[in-house]
Every structure is written in C-alpha cells, then in structure tokens.
Amino acid sequence: MTELSPKYNPAEVEAGRYQKWLDADVFKPSGDQKAKPYSIVIPPPNVTGKLHLGHAWDTTLQDIIIRQKRMQGFDTLWLPGMDHAGIATQAKVEERLREQGISRYDLGRDKFLDKVWEWKDEYATTIKEQWGKMGLSVDYSRERFTLDEGLSKAVRKVFVDLYKKGWIYRGEFIINWDPAARTALSDIEVIHKDVEGAFYHMNYMLEDDSRALQVATTRPETMFGDVAVAVNPEDPRYKDLIGKHVILPIVNKLIPIVGDEHADPEFGTGVVKITPAHDPNDFEVGQRHNLPQVNVMNDDGTMNELAGDFAGMDRFEARQATVAKLEELGALVNIEKRVHSVGHSERSGAVVEPRLSTQWFVKMDELAKQAMDNQETDDRVDFYPPRFNDTFLQWMENVHDWVISRQLWWGHQIPAWYNAEGEIYVGEEAPEGDGWTQDEDVLDTWFSSALWPFSTMGWPDTDVEDFKRYFPTSTLVTGYDIIFFWVSRMIFQSLEFTGRQPFQNVLIHGLIRDEEGRKMSKSLGNGIDPMDVIEKYGADSLRWFLSNGSAPGQDVRFSYEKMDASWNFINKIWNISRYILMNNEGLSLEEAESNVAKVAASEAGNVTDQWILHNLNETIAKVTENFDKFEFGVAGHILYNFIWEEFANWYVELTKEVLYSDNEAEKVITRSVLLYTLDKILRLLHPIMPFVTEEIYAQYAQGSIVTVDYPTVTPAFENEAAHKGVESLKDLIRAVRNARAEVNVAPSKPITILVKTADSELEDFFTSNVNYIKRFTNPEKLEISSAIAAPELAMTSIITGAEIYLPLADLLNVEEELARLDKELAKWQKELDMVGKKLGNERFVANAKPEVVQKEKDKQADYQAKYDATQERIAEMHKLVK
C-alpha cells in the first residue's frame, strides 16, 4: 500500500492516467456474450474547432452512464466519432484561405478539399486530446467519421432507396438561400430574429392611368421580379380589375392583375405584389396562375442584369437605391417603420433570402407518419424528461419536405448523374459509359448524421457482429436545441431502413449559460474553455459540477464559485481517504469485507458501525435508482450528503473514540468498516469522478476501479434500530452544540447537560453510548434519566423522545451577555442609518450605476436581518431571567 500525497493536486492525479486506461484496453466491450449489451454512440462533434463547455457537459453525462453500466456488468460500447459538418467546416476553411488572399475557386474543388481534410485532421487530433483530458471511456478502435467510406456507402444506399420509392425528388421551388455560404438551407437551419425594418408602400398605376393600386413590401429590391399583382376575387373594390394590367414602376413593364384568395381584403389595401421567384406564397400563386418566375438576384445576394441600373449592387444597397428611385418617380407613398421577424442563417448569420432554386428534397409525409405511429408502440423511443416526446411529435406533425442539397464542396456528393439528353441517373455507383456528369452539390450534413446510430455499426451490412449486438443503441444524450435537426431525423431514418428505433432512451439536457443566465456566445465574450477549467480545477471537479448542475431538460449556469465548491468536495474526499488509509495498518479489502459481515450479523463492532452500513445501503439504493432515471443531480446530492455529512462529519469523527483507544479487536473492526465504506463510496463516485477514485482505489487494491463491480444493496445491513438510535444520538449532540453557539459558549468550556426521557429504550441507548455524547459535547456533568426536573433558568431543546436542559448559570453571565448584545444592536443600527441615508439620496440613486445601487440595497437587507436577529436574541435573554 502506498500513501496519498498530503495535498489533493488534480494535475498530479490526472497526469498519465488516461493513457494507462487506454493501454489496458478497459474501455472496449467485454465480449461477454452472456452479459446484456449497453451501447451509446457519441453525438459526433463538428470538426470546426475545439470543443466547448456544452460538449463537455454532453459527454460527461454519457461517460457517467457508460462507466456505471460497465461496472454493473453490462457489455458496454461507447462509440466515438466526428461529423464533417459541411457548411460550418467549409466556412472555417474559406475564412482561413481569405486571410491568405485565396478563395476556394482559386484552388478548384480537389485542392480545396485537400485543405479541408488538413483542417479535419488538425481539429480531430485536438478533439481527441480534449476527450482524453475529460476522461471519456470511449472505444477508439471503433471511431468513425461521417465521411468514412463505410458511412458514405450507407448514405448512398439511403439516398438511392428513397429516390426509388419516390420519397426523394428534384424540383424547382422556393428555398431558404444563404448568400454568404451560397447554399440552400432547410427550414430548421434558419433562425428568426426580430429586427428594425419597414413596410414600403408604393403605387402601381393601371395601364390606362385611371387609378393606382397600392402595394406594400419589406423587400422593394425584389420588385424587378414582380410578374403580377393579386386581389381577392370576392373583393368588391377590385374584382372588376381582374384581367387588366398595371405598370411596374422603374421597369415600365405591364403585369397582369390576377384574382387569388392569397390576397386578404382585411390586410392592408387588399392588393399584393406577386414575385414567384422570391417568395414562397407568391410561388404558389404563380403556380396556380401559370405566371413566369423571374429571379433577379445572383447567388451571392447581389442583383443580376434583370435589375437594370441596379445590377451588381448588394441587395440591401439596391433596396435603398430602389426606394430613392420610387420616391423620385412619385411612386413611393410612405415608409412605415416596424419591427418584424427576419430569417438568418444558423451557420453564417447572413439574412436568408427566399429564392427560386432547383434542389433535391426528401418527401416527409410518410416518414413522419412512421415516426409518430412508432411512438404508440412498445418499440417507442422514451424521452427524458417525457415532455420532449410532445415536442418531437408536434414537430413531426408540422414538418415540411426537407431540402437536402447544399451548394458546397465539402460533404457527401449527391449520387446523381446527368447527360446531355437531360436524363438523370441515380445510383450507388457511377453509371457505365461516357457522357455522364455527377451533380456537383453535396448532401445536408444532417442527412448523413441521421444515419449515425446504425451506419457506425456496419449497416447496410446487417450481419456484422456490432450491428447485431449493439443496435438499437441504448441511450442517446443530447441537447434540446437539436431535437429537430438530429433526433427526429435519426428516428425516422432508422425506422425506415432498419425497422427499429435507433435508441431506446433519449436523455435531453439544456444549454450551458453564464452566471447571469445568458447563453454563452462569442459576441458576448462569455464563453468558457473547458480545458482552462480543467487546468485550474481538474477534470473531476468539472465533471462533478456538470453532473450536478441541473435536472434533465434544464439549463445549467456555470460559475467559478460552483467550481470552487466542487474542488472542495473532492478535497474533502481526499482528506478522509488519507485519514482512513493512514490508520489502516495494512488491512486488506478482503479482510475488511469479512469483518464487515460480522458487524452486519451483530457478531462484532458497535452501533455506529451498524448505523453507517445501514445508511450506506440506503445511499446505494437511492443513487442507483436516480442513475436509472438519469437524475444525476439528485444522485449527486444524495452522495454529497452521505459522504460529507454522515460519513466524514459523523462516522469518521465517531470512530476516533475507538481508534484512539487500546482495544485492538475493536480497532480492527472500525478500520474494516472505514475501508469498506470508503471503497463503496469510491465505486459510487467513479462514474462521475474517474481520476481521483482510481488514484485512491490504487492505494489499497489491485487492478483498476474502472472494471470492478458497482455497489448493490446488502439486505444484512438493514438495521432500523441502529439507525434510529444513532440519529437520536446525533440530535442530542446537535442540540447541545446549537445551544452553545446561541449563547457564544466555546466548545472547550465544560457545561452541565441534563437529558430527560420517558423512553426507557432511548435512556438505555444514551447511557450505553455515553462516551460518544461526552466526546462531542464536553460536559462537566451529564445526567440521563426520566426523573430529571426542569431547572428554572436553562436553555431547553426538544428532540424526539427527550428534553435537554443546559442550566444557564453554567453557560454565561446574563447581564454581561445583554450588555454585549446591546452594543451589537447599536452597531447594526448605525450601519442601517448610513446605508439608509445613501439610498435616500435621490441624486445617488439616479446617477450611480445600477449594480452600485443594488449593492447598497443588498447591504441594507443584510444589516436589517442582523439587527432583527440581535433584537430577537435580546428578547430571548430577557425571557430567561424573568
């Protein structure tokens, strides 16, 4: 047995430990065919950069689950991997190239992709280093990447099969266009933000100049693509105009007036300009009336030649120029300022442009129906918390067809080929013969990510061992922000292609926020690098904080104060471990287990030993129950209370009565219970704190704690009598300590303690354990009896089954205490007067920073609480001397 260093130093504890685990292959599946499999696939982080605190939280929860299941004897697989993240990674590489004055077009597709692969290799290495720092017990022999050949094969098969079923189609429709990334976006890649904008009201004159029709738009630059104006066919103001024409301002082109129910007589003037190539509703109107589709923008958001004098201008520059021209022509009626919702690209942040474009789509109605129907079966996916099942179903009920093509170079190139005759060939391999050109677009990143749970297991080969044994996976851990992006798509793709759900459970967590509750972002500058936190506090401290920060589905607020508390808790565990191991005298764990069995059988030990084993049993049961429900915060609270309060503050202190005695037989039993309980604590903690538990475990046992058995309940430890007795003993000791503190009597001063109880069993228990009472209360005189009369002047405390009297004469000089309290009251009054004067100054309140004013208000509340408490104490003292 070696000795723990005097001070807990996480850097020393964690250094080299991860590599030792990897060298020992402890993270690989056991291969035990009799064991029940338990598998998790890691939500693959994007190879766009370093991992953030949200990744640390997400992976910590997964590691807790997989480590516990491994210890419980499951055949566990935690499969790691990364996502190519098409649009995001390409944007990062293009940004790096721009800094060198190079564009992707300068390089060409192949050389540009070489640069992206270099980026991927660089950041994949960084991510794996971060995983190691976090202590993640993943099986690297099964690591996957979404552009691996095996996964690419799965992607091609899914695309081709859906195409053959008619569930993937190509067509020209209005899509969300990102002018910065120059690619299409799906609906859920668009973030809507309220922005300051305007409605521009303008007149379109009838061709005979008899009257003008007023229309309004937030995007006047699109008017060059107007091909009609629409009125409601039932609107008496305009129905006689249907079939006539108006003159499109600036362009001086005649466009028809059509009757369509899209025009709402109750909204605005009841007249709507129709721009089929730049608005989804207008596109539908155009389809109904066979109107032309005029696209007036380039893919970078500049105006094309159809915008006339405005060609080449950025769309927002063109907006102002168009409005100025309309005003010059007298066609601008007014500008109505208003805040409205505008879509922004989730990746680039650019304002999204609705744009007519030829794209590939997934038809969603049947896939969504399968997913919703499955939630009514025994094969459903269980969400934790359950409310997210409703979120999932609601989205599925309202889902639109999914645009899956992206105008990028980095990603899975669409397996479709075209020839000069206009034929399309879709297949897993290129068509035979010459004259075929592959579609240059790539698939949406989420298309390949949706196959992650089964493509990583070897699908479409369903005979491989991993697919047969570990699919469906057991649990997915992910944030609520990607239920739509990813979780839902994995479910419907898995059901369609494997006939099974992709995972049995989904544990949803929230977002990491800063101390003020704000989302962490670059713009706010409040992001936290988890590696910086680990460098200061250690991975175990960070993991403890992340696992205890919130309940499933809730956000967590990061603060360094909480990190300090996490470190302090581990330091406490370290110190009590040192105490136990230093007093261990060479006792082995096997010997300790044998001696503990004697305690459970009441053949050895004392009531405090039986009490701690009973409480350990309860702790094991409650922690396991909450782990099974993914309530790690509740489990952590139970562990913290047992370790710090019951074990360290009470049992370890109680054992000193034995360890400092001359009774060698009792010492062996006490050491055994200490070592046994510590061992179970370390095993319970290991899934959360892998490094420090391994370090301490190695001091008294062989092998790694990673693969030892997880604690289970021992029926023989149940002992309600011992539990009840020691809890009463603790109540008595606490009551005396509190009374001392109330009247400022030092623990070192001996006092008289009178314990009155009519419960003969309790009296016998206190009497037989009087040594513990004396050790913790320092009495000059201690009486325990049913015949005690209450003294006239005494502090009285009532606990279950007993009354405790502390004669006042032994405690303090009442007159001196009252004088001291009067001085204290005057002090708090003075502080209240000072802060009250400051807050009563209107100039101070008006001109000082809000946080300064709040600080003074906090002071006032604190002083008032102290003043009130002192007043109450004075009143109590007066009652005692009456």
Swiss-Prot record:
Position of sequence motif 'KMSKS' region: 519-523
One Gene Ontology cellular component annotation held by this UniProt entry: cytosol
E.C. no: 6.1.1.9
Broad class of enzyme this protein falls into: ligase
Positions annotated to bind ATP: K522
Tree of life domain: Bacteria
GO BP: valyl-tRNA aminoacylation
Keywords assigned: Aminoacyl-tRNA synthetase, ATP-binding, Coiled coil, Cytoplasm, Ligase, Nucleotide-binding, Protein biosynthesis
Compartment list: Cytoplasm
Annotated coiled-coil segments of the chain: 808-882
UniProt entry tagged with the keyword Cytoplasm: yes
Catalytic activity: tRNA(Val) + L-valine + ATP = L-valyl-tRNA(Val) + AMP + diphosphate
Keyword Endoplasmic reticulum: no
Gene Ontology MF term list: aminoacyl-tRNA deacylase activity; ATP binding; valine-tRNA ligase activity
InterPro entries (UniProt xref): aa-tRNA-synth_I_CS (IPR001412), aa-tRNA-synth_Ia (IPR002300), Anticodon_Ia_Val (IPR033705), M/V/L/I-tRNA-synth_anticd-bd (IPR013155), Rossmann-like_a/b/a_fold (IPR014729), tRNA-bd_arm (IPR010978), tRNAsynth_Ia_anticodon-bd (IPR009080), Val-tRNA_synth_C_sf (IPR037118)
Location of the motif 'HIGH' region: 45-55
Oligomeric form and interacting partners: Monomer.
Function: Catalyzes the attachment of valine to tRNA(Val). As ValRS can inadvertently accommodate and process structurally similar amino acids such as threonine, to avoid such errors, it has a 'posttransfer' editing activity that hydrolyzes mischarged Thr-tRNA(Val) in a tRNA-dependent manner.
Domain notes: ValRS has two distinct active sites: one for aminoacylation and one for editing. The misactivated threonine is translocated from the active site to the editing site.
Sequence similarity: Belongs to the class-I aminoacyl-tRNA synthetase family. ValS type 1 subfamily.
Annotated protein name in UniProt: Valine--tRNA ligase
Organism whose genome encodes this protein: Streptococcus pyogenes serotype M18 (strain MGAS8232)
